[in-house]
């Protein structure tokens, strides 16, 4: 397994698919990186030479934010929004959907498991 941005990428998959295992790289960015490195997108990761691996690593490290750096930036952005108490920050604090989704009947994943109302009994027939 080749290691890029401290992630083991799978050997038996195409390079474009393998690069998407790195947090922050999607299919479009992976294709762009392959073009910059002048490596075929259809090449398997196990077929890469050491020189090609080094060029991939250099391109990713110099031009893109991935893995830990990107996670840290996202976390800091959310913390900043919470600190300035903007609308999105308040939604994060209250653990509600941030981007305008409905919450009346949905958003169970974000809100957590449904809690029954205490004291309410079902009618006996």
UniProtKB/Swiss-Prot annotation:
What do the Gene Ontology cellular component annotations say? cytosol; small ribosomal subunit
| Family annotation (PANTHER family) | 30S RIBOSOMAL PROTEIN S13/40S RIBOSOMAL PROTEIN S18, SMALL RIBOSOMAL SUBUNIT PROTEIN US13M
Give GO MF terms, alphabetically. rRNA binding; structural constituent of ribosome; tRNA binding
Q: What lineage does the source organism belong to?
A: Bacteria, Pseudomonadati, Pseudomonadota, Alphaproteobacteria, Rickettsiales
Gene that this sequence comes from = rpsM
| Protein name (database record) | Small ribosomal subunit protein uS13
This molecule's function is given as: Located at the top of the head of the 30S subunit, it contacts several helices of the 16S rRNA. In the 70S ribosome it contacts the 23S rRNA (bridge B1a) and protein L5 of the 50S subunit (bridge B1b), connecting the 2 subunits; these bridges are implicated in subunit movement. Contacts the tRNAs in the A and P-sites.
Please give the NCBIfam families that the UniProt record associates with this protein: uS13_bact
UniProt record similarity statement? Belongs to the universal ribosomal protein uS13 family.
Quote any Pfam family the record assigns. Answer: Ribosomal_S13
Secretion signal span: none
